[in-house]
Structures are given as structure tokens and as C-alpha cells.
Regions:
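His/Asp/Glu-rich mid-to-C-terminal helical/loop segments that flank catalytic regions of hydrolases
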Residues: 1, 105-139
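Metal-dependent peptidase/peptidase-like ectodomains
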Residues: 7-106
Length: 139
């Protein structure tokens, strides 16, 4: 398992694009990529942007969430190309972008007020629990 922080997202995804072109591990060996950008908010619905390859296992996320009730709903969207999972999705890596938009902290995202003090961490535990449960069941 790798935890990777990319630089250059707001400059055309330069960091993630470079890594996707020069991976430490061959991309076809990545079982699933999780993009956890912008999850510090309190909306009870979790926004999920899912790659085409990621859709093969996405029903498992829905099943786990239905069983455990981590979020009111998983609000699935098509790829938008505006975050670091996108260069991997274009290369057929299964991935999901979790973003908690529309809560009380969303108005601060990508502004000078996007600070620790204005972040809301209530959705961290359910997000990570959902991911841990998913990984433990992934075939």
C-alpha cells in the first residue's frame, strides 16, 4: 500500500500526471486508487467520482455503505478530470475520488480560508472505515 501526495494539482495535474507516466509500481498492478482530496466537511452524502475500471468494484462500496450506514448516500459521478486520480483513470487504473462537497466547510475549499481551523473532520472516520472494509473484501 502506498500513500502518495502529489504537487501541482492546480497547475494541470502535473504531479500526478508525471507519476502516472513514471510509476514506481506498474500501473496494471494497482488494485485500486483512492483520491481523498477535500473530505474535511460534514455533508452526510459522500461524492464519489469513479473511473470506468473502478466501476467494476463500485457496487461493493454501495453494498458496504448500505450494510454499515457510513453515509446517507454515495453520490456517484462520472470522471471530471479535475483531480489527481484522473491521469490514472485515463490509463485504466481502477480509482475513486471521494470529495465531501456541500457541507459547512465547502465554501472555504481552495481559498485563503482553507485552513485547519475551518476544516470539519466528522467524515474522516466513516470515509476511512468504508475504504478499510472495501480493501478487506476486494477480490
Amino acid at each position: 500500500m502506498y500513500f502518495i501526495a502529489f504537487s501541482g494539482e492546480d497547475a494541470n495535474l502535473r504531479g500526478s500526471e508525471w507519476y502516472a507516466e513514471h510509476p514506481l509500481t506498474p500501473l496494471d498492478q494497482i488494485k485500486y486508487l483512492f483520491n481523498l482530496d477535500m473530505i474535511a466537511d460534514n455533508n452526510p452524502a459522500q461524492y464519489c467520482e469513479v473511473s470506468n475500471e473502478g466501476m467494476k468494484q463500485y457496487p461493493l462500496f454501495e453494498k458496504i455503505n448500505a450494510e454499515k450506514g457510513y453515509f446517507k448516500e454515495l453520490d456517484r459521478h462520472e470522471l471530471d478530470g479535475n483531480s489527481d486520480h484522473y491521469p490514472f483513470a485515463l490509463r485504466n487504473v481502477p480509482c475513486i475520488f471521494f470529495m465531501n462537497e456541500g457541507g459547512d466547510a465547502f465554501k472555504y475549499y481552495h481559498t485563503i480560508y482553507d485552513t485547519w481551523e475551518n476544516s470539519i473532520f466528522g467524515n474522516y472516520e466513516p470515509t476511512f472505515s468504508l475504504i478499510i472494509d472495501f480493501i478487506s473484501r476486494l477480490q
